Structure formats: structure tokens, C-alpha cells
């Protein structure tokens, strides 16, 4: 790439989806399987993966991706998979299946032991990257609805790799003093692009606050700012909205995002559509929150639907001008404690494509009224 070449619109980002086979529509976008396969096929030096857990062998397509990684590692490509210390259940089986892949467990909050690694992203050769809500599991690759972004624009991939370096510094096998020193070395150079300096209309946001480095944007600050500044429309497709934070088994009210949605509907007359998931992984407060929003804003332009098939898509669109794709729920525990990276864009084409996905999901036969 020429050093003074113009930045491509949208930083060469393409939307990526996993759609279960039992859905009544198909995607026009790259599939998660195709995305991961391309990253592996084109890799020459390294592939770095961050995911809460690692269970690719649970589906046929997931197993195919893991076999491709195994082949790449046997050819000398450096492969590191970061996973949370509490998500390592399948680690022994995977290590025996492929000893050349380096699996590293991390604990991003050894002091309080409440934070998890939620980030779902891949980076290869400082040239290609994926970020979204597909963890490195067979379900995310094949049977659970997910949404992410793939880019082969090197500056963006390099910026995401900085996040990998940050999470890697919290290797749970190291002692706390080494963790702190390592983190201190990588955090000051943790980002090049942010809300005030996007590249091609694209930037990343980060969580939690104690992992922020120089010029990073806190994800919750950006999300709430966008919700508070919404003028015409807010479209949300999420597994759950939970206005609480859980610590040591106790729940504490965390209304920041919840209140911002209500204020937009009641105070400013913003049209809001909320599509929530409804499956066994939902927080107990999730459906109660959806019903409370529906009831409280009954005199306003706020609609709530429930998606009946396993849906881990986490998407926010504001005023048809901004899109946010993340791996975290709008959940106080996630935003206060967990480590993740979100994708943000004001590029018109990317926002338009994300909007079409939301519209498709909203009118599909899988979306049911909350009142039914």
C-alpha cells in the first residue's frame, strides 16, 4: 500500500453474517465461515484470535475452520488464541488436537475477578481483521445468528492488533506484577483511530475503562452520546438490555443506556425500534426490561419485538447515520466489568447495509410482537 494513498471509504469494511439454516431468509453478505476461511487462507505470518471461549468442534463448519487453522500452524504460521480463564472448558481437547496452536488464557481483572474477556475478533499479518459478535465456537460459525465486519485494510487491522496486545498482557499464567508492567507498556500506544479521528469513517471503541489507553474511546460514552443526540430514529437489535450490574451475586441499578432510550422516546419524540433475543442465555431481567420500555413509552413511537431464533446479533443504528456493532449486551455488568472491542462507522454505505439487515430482521417471520 502506498504511504500517501487515499483512505478508502469505510476502510474496506464488509459486513459478515452467520444465519442458521432454519431461517426464512438468506444473507447477501460474506458468511462468518467464508470470512474466517479467507483470513486463514491468506495468512503468511500470524493469526491472532480473541474470544471468551473456544469450542469450534461443536459444528461441522466450526471443525473445518479449526482444521484449517491446524494446517496453517503446521506450515509455520504463528497462531495465538486468547480466551477467558473461565471459558477454557474445551482447552485440553483442542490442545491435544493441535499442539502447534498457542492457547493463552487471560484474566483481565485479577484484583476483583469480575471481568471477562468478551471481545470477538481476529487479526492476521497486520493486513486483515474481523470484529463482531461471533466468538470462536461452532455455533457462531454455523448455527447462531451473528453479525460482524471484515476488512483487509492494513491500518485498521494494525489498530485492532493493538487491542489484542492489550488483552494478551493479562495472561493468567503470569504473576500480577508482570501483568501490570506488560499492560503499562502496550496501553499508551493502544489506538490510532477514534471518534475524533476515524479512518474512512470507521473507528473502534473499548471497554472496560481500566483498559483504556491513549486516545481510546470508552464504548459506553460513545453509545450513550449517540443515543442522547439522536434526532429521528434509533434501531436496536440486541440479545438483551439489562439496566443492572452484578457483583458478588448482588444486583445494582445501572440505568445509563436504559434512561437514554426512554429520554429519546419521551423527551424528543425519536422513533425507536427494539428487537430483542429470547433464548435460554438471556439475563432474567432482559424480557422485564423490554416490557417496561414498551409500557413506559406506550404514548410514544417505541416498538418492541422478540426474535424467536437464537440471535446473538448486537447492532445499533442512530439516525441512519451511525452504526455500532459489538460483542456485549446493553448490560451494566458487561459495560462496567468486561473487556471487548466494538466497531463504529459513520460511512454512509456501511450504515445503509446495516440498516437493511435490521429492516430484514424486523419484518421477518421470526420477529414477533412483544404483546403476542
UniProtKB/Swiss-Prot annotation:
InterPro entries: Diverse_PLD-related, PLDc_3, PLipase_D/transphosphatidylase. Induction: Expressed in the intermediate phase of the viral replicative cycle. It is an enzyme of class 3 (hydrolase). The keyword Hydrolase applies. GO terms for cellular component: host cell endoplasmic reticulum membrane; host cell Golgi apparatus; membrane; viral envelope; viral membrane; virion membrane. Palmitoylated. Attachment of the palmitate moiety is essential for correct intracellular targeting and protein function. A motif (YPPL) lies at residues 153-156. Its EC number is 3.1.1.-, 3.1.4.4. One of its GO terms (biological process) is viral budding via host ESCRT complex. Major envelope protein that plays a role in the biogenesis of the viral double membrane and in egress of virus from the host cell. Produces the wrapped form of virus that is required for cell-to-cell spread. Acts as a lipase with broad specificity including phospholipase C, phospholipase A, and triacylglycerol lipase activities. Belongs to the orthopoxvirus OPG057 family. Late-budding domains (L domains) are short sequence motifs essential for viral particle budding. They recruit proteins of the host ESCRT machinery (Endosomal Sorting Complex Required for Transport) or ESCRT-associated proteins. F13 contains one L domain: a YPPL motif, which might interact with PDCD6IP/AIP1. PANTHER family: GM01519P-RELATED, PHOSPHOLIPASE D - RELATED. Interacts with protein OPG190. This is Envelope phospholipase OPG057. It comes from Vaccinia virus (strain Ankara).
Amino acid at each position: 500500500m502506498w504511504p500517501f494513498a487515499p483512505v478508502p471509504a469505510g476502510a474496506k469494511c464488509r459486513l459478515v453474517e452467520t444465519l442458521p439454516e432454519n431461517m426464512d431468509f438468506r444473507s447477501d453478505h460474506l458468511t462468518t465461515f467464508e470470512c474466517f476461511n479467507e483470513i486463514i487462507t491468506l495468512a503468511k505470518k500470524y493469526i491472532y484470535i480473541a474470544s471468551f471461549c473456544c469450542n469450534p468442534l461443536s459444528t461441522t463448519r466450526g471443525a473445518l475452520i479449526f482444521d484449517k487453522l491446524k494446517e496453517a500452524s503446521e506450515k509455520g504460521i504463528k497462531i495465538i488464541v486468547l480466551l477467558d480463564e473461565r471459558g477454557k472448558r474445551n482447552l485440553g481437547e483442542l490442545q491435544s488436537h493441535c499442539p502447534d496452536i498457542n492457547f493463552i488464557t487471560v484474566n483481565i481483572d485479577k484484583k476483583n475477578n469480575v471481568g471477562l474477556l468478551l471481545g470477538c475478533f481476529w487479526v492476521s499479518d497486520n493486513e486483515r481483521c474481523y470484529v463482531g459478535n461471533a466468538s470462536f465456537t461452532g455455533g457462531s460459525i454455523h448455527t447462531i445468528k451473528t453479525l460482524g465486519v471484515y476488512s483487509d485494510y492494513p491500518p485498521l487491522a494494525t489498530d485492532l492488533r493493538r487491542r489484542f496486545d492489550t488483552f494478551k498482557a493479562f495472561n493468567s499464567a503470569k504473576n500480577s506484577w508482570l501483568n501490570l508492567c506488560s499492560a503499562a507498556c502496550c496501553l499508551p500506544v493502544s489506538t490510532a483511530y477514534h471518534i475524533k479521528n476515524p479512518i474512512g469513517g470507521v473507528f473502534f471503541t473499548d471497554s472496560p475503562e481500566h483498559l483504556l489507553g491513549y486516545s481510546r474511546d470508552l464504548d459506553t460514552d460513545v453509545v450513550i452520546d449517540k443515543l442522547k443526540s439522536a434526532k429521528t430514529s434509533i434501531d436496536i437489535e440486541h440479545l438483551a438490555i439489562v439496566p443492572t450490574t452484578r457483583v458478588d451475586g448482588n444486583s445494582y441499578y445501572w440505568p445509563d443506556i436504559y434512561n437514554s432510550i426512554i429520554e429519546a422516546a419521551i423527551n424528543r419524540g425519536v422513533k425507536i425500534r427494539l428487537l430483542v433475543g429470547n433464548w435460554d442465555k438471556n439475563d432474567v431481567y432482559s424480557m422485564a426490561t423490554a416490557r417496561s420500555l414498551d409500557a413506559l413509552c406506550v404514548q410514544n413511537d417505541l416498538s418492541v419485538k422478540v426474535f424467536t431464533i437464537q440471535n446473538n446479533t448486537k447492532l445499533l443504528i442512530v439516525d441512519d447515520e451511525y452504526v455500532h456493532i459489538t460483542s456485549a449486551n446493553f448490560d451494566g455488568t458487561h459495560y462496567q466489568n468486561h473487556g471487548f472491542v466494538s466497531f463504529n462507522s459513520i460511512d454512509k454505505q456501511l450504515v445503509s447495509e446495516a440498516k437493511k439487515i435490521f429492516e430484514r430482521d424486523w419484518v421477518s417471520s421470526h420477529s414477533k410482537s412483544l404483546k403476542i
